[in-house]
Amino acid sequence: YQRFFMAEFISLYSGSSGNSSVVRCGQRYLIVDMGKGVRTTSAALKALGLAVSDCDGILVTHEHSDHVKGLSTFLKKNTLPVYGAAATLDFLDSNGIVPASCELHELEGREEDVGAFGVQSFPTSHDVPCVGYRIHTPDGKTMTIATDLGVLTPPVHEALSGCDLVALESNYDLHMLRSGPYPYYLRARIESTRGHLSNDECSAKLLELIQEGCKKFALCHLSQENNTPALALQTVFNTLGAAGVVPEKD
């Protein structure tokens, strides 16, 4: 993982098969999503020296399995509060994904205290109710995590502005998607305004944010079938280079 400042954004795993990240400041941290099994997630936390007792809660972006697959077993073994939009919490509760004893807390737009952190949710354009998170850390930094969005709407633009770090979806390369094995309906879903953000769309937004003063970025939720890390990075470098911006690879 990468250390950006005292507060850290750490991707535990990311991609089509599962997504989870950590926002950490000192000994306290938040988990955002848990899309792989409890063994994978627990091993990733242990490798970072993170004890569950130091976690202030789990933030859930939406109900898709690549974001919640590991929650059920993890929460049977560990007692942590879960935060999210009302529709997502209702889904988790009604489908038995979270234990009946689990504390569920709605986050609906205004900033709320989640342990040592200030957390504000904002809606993203996806094919189920979905949110991103703007997080204020105890050391005064601001991070925004925005994945699973087909288009950059005004609430997303607002949430991405003025951050110390932005973790933004760079899901697919358009050529790989259109020339790949996916059936038409699935390609259309991914490309739609309720699907996912392409490398080109992500890169254009990163250029805007750099021009506004943001300096730290993480590319997230890369498709294993329709993208590669090298291609996502090269798209960013090409976009920035065309604008005369020289990026640093961290």
What are these regions (language model features)?
Residues I10-S20, T61-L71, S121:
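Structured catalytic core of nucleotide-sugar glycosyltransferases
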Residues I31-G35, C55-E63, Y83-A86, T144-T147, ...:
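Active-site neighborhood of phospho(di)ester-bond hydrolases with catalytic His/Asp-centered motifs
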Residues F4-L48, V131-T147, L165:
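Conserved beta-strand hairpin/beta-sheet module of binuclear metal-dependent hydrolase folds
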Residues K69-N78, D93-G96, N227-Q234:
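Metal-dependent catalytic neighborhoods of phosphoester/phosphodiester hydrolases
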Residues A86-G140:
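Metallo-beta-lactamase
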Residues V38-G84:
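Active-site metal-binding motif and surrounding structural segment of the metallo-beta-lactamase
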Residues S17, H64-V68, L89-F91, P129, ...:
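Active-site environment of divalent metal-dependent phosphoester hydrolases
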Residues P154-K249:
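Cap/insert and terminal regions of metallo-dependent hydrolase folds
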